[in-house]
């Protein structure tokens, strides 16, 4: 959702578009061309495709299917797709059939108060819908192949994040917890990062949940949690 009243307060897509650093939509053929070159020239091992949160009932799943089909036709490259819960769980199998091997559906925040304040558009999708979608997606992609971003430092407490991470891990969803980093030009540009102590206390608690439920980032086929560059969670698995 790209309207100011409903957009995620941390999102910089509009700034990137305004500054000419990206285009509104990368066509499937463009993605396939770049993916093939990335594998051949830079030995890239996996790819992430995301749509933001388009105002369509499929929440971007249709364009992800089209794009993944183009890429996997051109090159053998594991793909993680990222979207919000679509209107129909049948989209998960369609994504899998198009070549997507891992899926991200991102909570960002874990309590309703923070969700309403930080991302009013995404907050219109209730947490219980996320969990019904998580359960359906895990049936298609497998345990540990579905993940969700959680941004620590937006206002959720340590306990709230740890408890949500345990709930997610218990159903086979990898809770990829990362410290919030403000981006210039966004409404949260002046919002503080979480302090080191907060993250140092939080990571071991999440790591315990990952071990308890047999989830490990190295086993993820593709995506952000597999890379892990923006979080220290890998060191606590």
Please name every model-derived segment.
Residues 121-128, 152-159, 194-197:
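A short glycine-/small-residue-rich loop at the edge of a beta-strand within enzyme catalytic domains
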